[in-house]
Amino acid sequence: VHVISRKPFNEAIASFPGCAIALVDLLNVLEKKTFSDPQEMKSYLPSLDNFKYRKKWWVVDVAGNSLRLIAFMDFRLQKVFVKHIVSHAEYDRLTKYYRSHTE
């Protein structure tokens, strides 16, 4: 899969240094694997779930559920654009925002 930018990972590593190994591991899985569909990705990332307030956005728990990654994923084109890597509190705030600000 082509991860469009590493910047969100670098920023998350700086903000959450205790989760750095898990973030690097996740980035490596995304960059080294090819996933034809969400079910195949879920076999590597069991926490993968649809972010229901945006089309083609997905959520992955990171570092034992310490962080959440929210990303646009196009399985046909093999592209991932990470929108946010945040704590659960920030994830709840973002969910509330996207719920009330529809596309």
Region roles according to the model:
Residues 1-66, 74-81, 88-103:
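Basic, Lys/Arg-enriched alpha-helical interface segments
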